[in-house]
């Protein structure tokens, strides 16, 4: 992730994998509600989160949602990063 990777499906898959792995670790530590990872959180990075205009501008957008331990709906965080730069 980062470096000079192109802002494409490969980068997005890498982001989903790495962020998903981090969120799964938090899930296993009891950080979220839900009995399965898919009930506890989601990671979305694709053509819906990152438009062609974003790609043209070198921006990748990631949505991360999670079900907090305290009663609430999902908390959703949008992260934008210039592709090819360190996070």
Feature annotation, model-predicted:
Residues 1-87:
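Structured, hydrophobic secondary-structure cores that serve as assembly/anchoring elements
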């Amino acid at each position: 992730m980062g470096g000079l990777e192109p802002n494409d499906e490969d980068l997005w898959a890498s982001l989903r994998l790495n962020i998903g792995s981090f969120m799964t670790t938090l899930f296993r530590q009891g950080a979220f509600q839900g009995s399965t990872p898919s009930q506890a959180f989601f990671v979305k990075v694709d053509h819906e989160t990152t438009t062609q205009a974003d790609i043209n501008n070198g921006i990748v957008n990631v949505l991360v949602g999670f079900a907090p331990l305290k009663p609430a709906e999902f908390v959703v965080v949008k992260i934008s990063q210039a592709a090819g730069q360190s996070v």
